Each structure stands twice: as C-alpha cells, then as structure tokens.
C-alpha cells in the first residue's frame, strides 16, 4: 500500500471532518428538504428547483467562489405550457497556473417521491436510522455534491492552501434529460473549460456495500419504438376476431423475435461491432469483490442467468443487452375487456458496449423487424423508430486522476478500489469527454444498496463523511501527481 501523502495535513483535515460531521449532515438535511423534482412539469416544483439552485449558489459564494448562474430561459412542454428552466451553476475557486484545475459535475434535481409510494419516512425529511440517512436525493446526487463542498470548506476552515483550482458545474435538470446542458458545454468549451485539466463525476454507486470503487466505463443506450397499426379505433373481438391481422399479435411476434430466453440478442450482426474482451479485463473482473449470493439476495431475484461472478459482470458491463419495456395501446387494467387494439406501440432498448454505434444498431434493428414483419404477411402497417441513441463511454484508467483517486481511496479506506463499469448509461460523461477533450473520471461515494430513484433512498453517514475525506485526499494526491512526481512502480 502506498504511504499517505501530506500525512500531517491529512490528519488535520480528517479530524476536522469527523468533528463537524453533524454540521455536514444538517446541511444535507436542509438540501433534501427542498422538493427539487425536475421530472414532473409543475410550476410549484420549478420554483423549488430555482430555490435549490439559489441555495447551492449561495453556499459556493460563501466558500469564496466566483459564481455564475446561467439563465437557460424556458422549456416548452408537450401540452403547450411553458416552464422556466432552472439555471446551471458555473463556479470557480482559485486560478493558480501552477496548480491542476479540476471541475466537479453534479446535479441537484431529484426523481419524484411521495410517502404513499412506499417510503418508510417522509422522503423530504432526512431521517437517520442505524447510520443510514434516508431522503430523496441523499445519494443521487445532493450527498456527493455536498461531500465535495465539505472537502473544499475544510481546507478553507483550517486556512490550508487548497492544492487544486476547483470549478463546479451544477445543474437542476439531470433527471429530465439534462435540458440545455450539452449546448452550454459546447458554448463554454473555450471559456469555462479552457483551463480545466480534469473533470470528476460522482453520480453512481459502488458494486458492494462496503468496498469503494472507481468507475471506468458505462454502456450506451438505443431506445426504440415499434408501432403496428390497423386503424385508430379499437375492435370488438366478437365482431372482428378471426377475420383480420390483429396488431397486438403482430407486435408480440416482433418483440419475441428480438431476444431469446438466455438473454442472447437475435438481431443479426448485433455483436459484430463489439470490442473484444481483453485478458486484462478478465483479470480485473476476477479481482472484483462481489458476493454473488449477497447480490442475488439484495436483488430479490430467485436466480440469475449466470452462475459465476465473471460471467455476470461480463454480461452486465461488456455485452450488449436488450430489454422490453412496455406496450402502449393495450388493455392493461383490471377486468375482462374483450377488445382488439387497433394500434399498439412496443418499447424496447439495447444497451451498447465499446465500439458499437447507435446508427449501425438502428439499421440492424430496423432491417430485422422489417424482415420478421414481412414473413407474417400482415395487412397492418409497421413503423420502427429510434428515439434515443447514446454511445458508451470508456475512461483511461492509467491517467493521472484515476491514479490520484486510487491512492486517495487507499488512504481513506485502506483498500484498493474495485475497478468497475456501469451497465447503465450516464450521457454526461461522454458529452464532457467528446466536447472538452478533458480527462473524465467517475468516482462514486454511495453503496450498492442506496436505492437511487427508488423508495427509501439513502446514503450511509459513513459513506457521506468518508466521501468528504476522500475528496480532500484526492485534491492532495492530484496536486502531487500533476506536479510531475513519479508514481511508484506497480501503483496501478
């Protein structure tokens, strides 16, 4: 294990964070109390979002940061109403050319939550039970944002020189698709981002409950709809059953042609683009700390498709997967309605892995469904549409900031982190990497059972406080490595 850097400084920083942890938890409580729901297009909730962004801006100003709240205008909703879009916060603290500049991305909006959804506590009242801090946004993403701020404020409180220049980009519309964020990043490429060396995102989770992780890749996502239509009106099955091609039967056949019972995608050529899995990756998966029995139990699944850790992780991270999500237009209420839908719309998505591109996948899927539909000789009309196409993201794990993060994790947690990938899609990582051409890293703080987006979302007090220490140690390590000091042989 590597010896901790600046041990005297670290000891003071860690001691301060421990002594002030109740204060840090109280601030998180104040932030969680704001119902900053960006998903439901309601004027009251937009006001809450603006209040949340203003509170964060004030917090950063109190740190001494120069803060710019970028006005994004308004958002036209499908029903015709116009709602104001909360500003994106761009903040800067320090501009010493001798120091590395690191930009932290976070979001302050949350998914909808109501106690009647199955919460054991009020989702907007941070409640501590057995060291777990329950509340909407506690782990996604208000807790990690505050952990970063806690680290910066600790240096300031102790009058310690902050070893890095810090920038913040905080948004309030991530859960609603990051409205206008990509355009802002493009616009600020040669301004706000010009002096940035590294970008850090802390918006995902560890793979376990206790062992920290670094995320080095995410899958992409292509979301499709397939419509089968006979007419706009539904049919009575007693009057029309047996004398026409039923749209639902066509759609079920189409959806059933996409994937088999073992999870293998049946679209011809879909695996051809996939990057080969290297021996280095296989070794990495072997070294990851994952208790399959615990993982299965916490998932409340009777059995997974794969029996080994390596197979499960490979199929979760490095193989594409296809999921069927739902059908519009079908009768799905209690009772026995004998209707034949006149039009149905199926929804499914494919998670992409390195070297796969949305445009090629779109062509392959469309050609496959057209071929299947043609063989049915149906008189109905079929239309396939790709409504979302997001590429996978891969990081350079041998870059400076991954080395710094690994060393910081070793210092704070006393273990080497799991190097994990994320089977989901986090578009902002790819957006930052492609537009700014800067080094992007995902450094999660939350445990696997934090329940982001779910009922009873939480962050452990331990994760929140140790995460604040982690970011403080990361600043020191990044400064040390960026200045050109040698990394010991075998450090990564």
Curated annotation (Swiss-Prot):
SUPFAM superfamilies: Zn-dependent exopeptidases (SSF53187). The keyword Metal-binding applies. Zn(2+) 1 binds at residues 140, 175, 453. GO terms for biological process: proteolysis; regulation of protein metabolic process. Detected exclusively in kidney. Its cofactor is Zn(2+). This is Beta-Ala-His dipeptidase. It comes from Rattus norvegicus.
């Amino acid at each position: 294990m590597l010896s901790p850097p600046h041990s005297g400084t670290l000891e003071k920083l860690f001691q301060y964070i421990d002594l002030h942890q109740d204060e840090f938890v109280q601030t998180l409580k104040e932030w969680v109390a704001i119902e900053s729901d960006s998903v439901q297009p309601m004027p009251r909730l937009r006001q809450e979002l603006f209040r949340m962004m203003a509170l964060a801006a004030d917090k950063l100003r109190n740190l001494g940061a120069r803060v710019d709240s970028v006005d994004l205008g308004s958002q036209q909703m499908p029903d015709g109403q116009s709602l104001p879009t909360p500003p994106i916060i761009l903040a800067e603290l320090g501009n010493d050319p001798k120091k590395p500049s690191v930009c932290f991305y976070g979001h302050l909006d949350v998914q909808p939550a109501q106690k009647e959804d199955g919460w054991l506590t009020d989702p907007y009242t941070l409640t501590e039970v057995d060291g777990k801090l329950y509340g909407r946004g506690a782990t996604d993403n208000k807790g990690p944002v505050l952990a970063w701020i806690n680290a910066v404020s600790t240096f300031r409180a102790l009058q310690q020189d902050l070893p890095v220049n810090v920038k913040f980009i905080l948004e309030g519309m991530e859960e609603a698709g990051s409205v206008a964020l990509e355009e802002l990043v493009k616009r600020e490429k040669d301004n706000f981002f010009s002096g940035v060396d590294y970008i850090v995102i802390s918006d995902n989770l560890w793979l376990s409950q206790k062992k920290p992780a670094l995320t080095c890749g995410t899958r992409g996502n292509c979301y499709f709809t397939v419509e089968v239509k006979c007419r706009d009106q539904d049919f009575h099955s007693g009057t029309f059953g047996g004398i026409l091609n039923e749209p639902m039967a066509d759609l079920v056949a189409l959806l059933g042609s996409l994937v088999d019972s073992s999870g293998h995608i049946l679209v011809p050529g879909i695996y051809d683009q996939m990057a080969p899995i290297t021996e280095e990756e296989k070794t990495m998966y072997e070294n990851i700390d994952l208790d399959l029995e615990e993982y299965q139990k916490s998932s409340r699944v009777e059995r997974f498709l794969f029996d080994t850790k390596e197979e499960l992780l490979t199929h979760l991270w490095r193989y594409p997967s296809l999921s069927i999500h739902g059908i519009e237009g079908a009768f799905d209420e209690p009772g026995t309605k004998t209707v034949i839908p006149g039009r149905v719309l199926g929804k499914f998505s494919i998670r992409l892995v390195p070297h796969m591109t949305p445009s090629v996948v779109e062509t392959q899927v469309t050609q496959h469904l057209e071929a299947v539909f043609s063989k049915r000789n149906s008189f109905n009309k079929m239309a396939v549409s790709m409504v979302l196409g997001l590429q996978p993201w891969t990081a350079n794990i041998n870059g400076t900031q991954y080395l710094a993060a690994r060393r910081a994790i070793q210092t704070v947690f006393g273990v080497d982190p799991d190097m994990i990938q994320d089977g989901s899609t986090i578009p902002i990582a790819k957006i930052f990497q492609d537009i700014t051409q800067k080094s992007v890293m995902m450094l999660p703080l939350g445990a696997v059972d934090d329940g982001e987006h779910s009922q009873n979302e939480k962050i452990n007090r331990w994760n929140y406080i140790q995460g604040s220490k982690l970011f403080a140690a990361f600043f020191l390590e990044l400064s040390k490595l960026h200045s050109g000091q040698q990394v010991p042989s075998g450090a990564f």
